[in-house]
From Swiss-Prot:
<keyword id="KW-0964">Secreted</keyword>
<keyword id="KW-0872">Ion channel impairing toxin</keyword>
<dbReference type="InterPro" id="IPR044062">
    <property type="entry name" value="LCN-type_CS_alpha_beta_dom"/>
</dbReference>
<feature type="disulfide bond">
    <location>
        <begin position="22"/>
        <end position="44"/>
    </location>
</feature>
<dbReference type="InterPro" id="IPR003614">
    <property type="entry name" value="Scorpion_toxin-like"/>
</dbReference>
<feature type="disulfide bond">
    <location>
        <begin position="15"/>
        <end position="37"/>
    </location>
</feature>
<dbReference type="InterPro" id="IPR036574">
    <property type="entry name" value="Scorpion_toxin-like_sf"/>
</dbReference>
<dbReference type="GO" id="GO:0019871">
    <property type="term" value="F:sodium channel inhibitor activity"/>
</dbReference>
<feature type="disulfide bond">
    <location>
        <begin position="26"/>
        <end position="46"/>
    </location>
</feature>
<dbReference type="GO" id="GO:0006952">
    <property type="term" value="P:defense response"/>
</dbReference>
<comment type="similarity">
    <text>Belongs to the long (4 C-C) scorpion toxin superfamily. Sodium channel inhibitor family. Beta subfamily.</text>
</comment>
<keyword id="KW-0528">Neurotoxin</keyword>
<keyword id="KW-0800">Toxin</keyword>
<dbReference type="GO" id="GO:0090729">
    <property type="term" value="F:toxin activity"/>
</dbReference>
<keyword id="KW-1015">Disulfide bond</keyword>
<dbReference type="GO" id="GO:0005576">
    <property type="term" value="C:extracellular region"/>
</dbReference>
<dbReference type="Pfam" id="PF00537">
    <property type="entry name" value="Toxin_3"/>
</dbReference>
């Protein structure tokens, strides 16, 4: 599974071309995952996630910002 991790506010985690930052963010939530900064979205994107990982779903997004 893969997807955009959410911050405490329910929004995607922003980044500016910093793959290491996103890798740390993804691994803080899911230890065996990987992550990178998705350039076009300027948001962290996680890969190698467990099936039950909660990632952003545009149909149920409750982002405060």
């Amino acid at each position: 599974k893969e997807g955009y991790p959410m911050g405490r506010d329910g929004c995607k985690i922003s980044c500016v071309i910093n793959n290491n930052f996103c890798k740390v963010e993804c691994q803080a939530k899911w230890r065996q995952s990987d992550g990178y900064c998705y350039f076009w979205g300027l948001s962290c994107y996680c890969t190698n996630l467990p099936d039950d990982a909660q990632v952003r779903d545009s149909s149920t997004n409750k982002c405060g910002g």
